[in-house]
Amino acid sequence: DKELINKKLEKIIICGTSLKDKEYLENLEYFKWLKFPKLNKPILGICGGMQIISLIFGGTLIENKEIGLIKIQFKKEFLNFKPSLNEVYLLHNYAAINKDFEVFAHSQEFEISQAIKHKTREIYGVLFHPEVRNKELIIKFCR
């Protein structure tokens, strides 16, 4: 219920799944509430959560398996990250592409979007897993 979400929740985190779990991509109808115009809660999508957000807002996915630690370049300040090179942990099969989101960070090797924000709403996405190596991002979002 969209009204209940607005009344009961302060912020929303949509987390990822295991590499083999692609069921969320086949059940996007469960996430259509993300586009509800009156939903004014900050949302953070992590890995599969970023992919879901991108698809719900009309984006696409490309196959892009990345596993392990890599360095990504932040172009602008994003939650707790300053513009700089940062080491993050990746574990995904797909990358998300969406023109309604600004790219704040990308992987250097493939130019894959790693941190995005909706251009007009407080909706963020990260393809990497901050719960593994960059917990301060989650803490900053939750404050």
What does each model-identified segment do?
Residues D1-G45, F57:
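Flexible gly/pro-rich beta->alpha loop and the following alpha-helix that scaffold active-site loops
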Residues L55-I123, F128-E136:
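Pocket-forming structural segment of enzyme catalytic cores
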